[in-house]
């Protein structure tokens, strides 16, 4: 593994910025109302810092230097991305920021929960185990897996706002004694070696500048004999970086989802082995013969919606729904009810949605490359 320059952590700086930008909106149950309660100047600072990595850098002109600069700023890039996008995610999707497989007439939220529980089942999570959730978001998967398995889960996150929302949600549902959420960079974890019985990551380690780097940290904090399970975002082996269309799909996903550099599935396999793990199983779950594609909500395919709530969710993801949201947010910005730049972030998420659908349909990308691995006992 070539050396990766890690960003210096400054938790005090991040906490102060979070307090200015978000105020008490982390306690707000409504993500829509939370979106309106931001400090305009701090929001602009986050917006400018994030988009300086992407503006005027299309796929046709992207250089290796551009990618290396994003990797060097991986933690800041991801942290500010979620400062900008978290409320939009919660409002348009749910509190579990990931995709899933769907069965016929299976409700959206049920499918999301099943996807989480499937990973927990494959890992053998049990009552009383001490488990780490790497890149826990606002805690949706941790809450579901805690209920399902009875495990005690620690969520690791480098975004203070998401930690605040995760803590608030855990308290509302009475899981605050079973769940703990802590601040940290998953490339330089502060936990002692051999701390956890199991570790999982659900569509989160894609934000790492090096998969081998983050997997090595996971290996260090996992107890000997412990299991690591991951759903990884990767480009498939069909991806050709010399193909401009392929690069446009990748770059659209990266920009719209706060990713410094996405790699191929084969790189992920090599990385988990290089970190020291015994790879027990790996599979692209998107390649299973499912009757409904994983990307159907993003594609706005209403024919697959199984309930009124699902229909509304999918409608919001459709081009018509996104057009309506675009104009709603533009109106809110015009009347200074939402901070300037909210529309830009929402539009960027829309571009990412189109690229995710294209990547899925053309078999260039998968959000569910599952790997189950074990740390040797000796």
Segment roles from a protein language model:
Residues 130-132, 142-188:
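Class I SAM-dependent methyltransferase SAM/SAH-binding core
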Residues 3-88:
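N-terminal auxiliary segments of SAM/dcSAM-dependent transferases
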Residues 212-227:
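A short glycine-rich, Lys/Arg-flanked "PGG" loop and its adjoining helix->strand segment in the class I
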Residues 135-139:
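Class I SAM-dependent methyltransferase "Motif I" SAM/SAH-binding loop
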Residues 62-70, 76-125:
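Class I SAM-dependent transferase core
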Residues 197-210:
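A short SAM/SAH-binding and catalytic strip from SAM-dependent methyltransferases
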Residues 241-368, 374-377:
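Substrate-binding/catalytic lobe of Class I Rossmann-like enzymes that use SAM or dcSAM, i.e.
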Residues 187-199:
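A short acidic, Gly/Pro-enriched loop at the edge of an enzyme's catalytic core
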């Amino acid at each position: 593994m070539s050396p990766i320059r890690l960003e210096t952590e400054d938790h005090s700086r991040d906490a102060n910025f979070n307090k200015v930008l978000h105020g008490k909106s982390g306690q707000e149950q409504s993500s829509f109302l939370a979106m309106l309660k931001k400090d305009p100047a701090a929001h602009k600072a986050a917006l400018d810092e994030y988009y300086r990595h992407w503006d005027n850098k299309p796929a046709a002109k992207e250089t290796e230097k551009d990618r290396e600069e994003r990797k060097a700023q991986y933690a800041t890039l991801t942290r500010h991305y979620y400062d900008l996008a978290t409320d939009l995610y919660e409002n348009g999707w749910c509190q579990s920021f990931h995709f899933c497989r769907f069965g016929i007439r299976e409700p959206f939220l049920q499918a999301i929960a099943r996807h989480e529980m499937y990973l927990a089942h494959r890992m053998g999570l049990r009552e009383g185990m001490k488990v780490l959730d790497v890149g826990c978001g606002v805690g949706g998967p941790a809450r579901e897996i805690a209920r399902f398995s009875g495990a005690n889960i620690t969520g690791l996150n480098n975004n203070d706002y998401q930690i605040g929302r995760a803590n608030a949600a855990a308290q509302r549902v009475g899981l605050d004694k079973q769940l703990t959420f802590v601040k940290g960079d998953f490339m330089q974890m502060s936990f002692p070696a051999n701390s956890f019985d199991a570790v999982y990551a659900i569509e989160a380690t894609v934000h790492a500048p090096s998969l081998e780097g983050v997997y090595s940290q996971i290996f260090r904090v996992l107890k000997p004999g412990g299991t690591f399970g991951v759903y990884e975002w990767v480009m498939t082996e069909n991806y050709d970086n010399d193909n401009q269309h392929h690069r446009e799909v990748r770059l659209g996903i990266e920009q719209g989802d706060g990713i410094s550099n996405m790699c191929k599935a084969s790189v992920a396999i090599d990385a988990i082995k290089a970190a020291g793990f015994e790879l027990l199983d790996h599979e692209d779950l998107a390649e299973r013969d499912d009757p409904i594609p994983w990307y159907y909500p993003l594609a706005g395919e209403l024919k697959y919606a199984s309930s009124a709530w699902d229909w509304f969710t999918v409608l919001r993801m459709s081009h018509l729904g996104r057009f309506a949201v675009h104009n709603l947010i533009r109106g809110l910005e015009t009347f200074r009810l939402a901070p300037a730049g909210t529309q830009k972030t929402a539009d960027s998420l829309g571009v990412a949605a189109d690229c995710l659908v294209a990547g899925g349909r053309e078999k260039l990308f998968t959000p569910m490359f599952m790997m189950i691995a074990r740390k040797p006992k000796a």
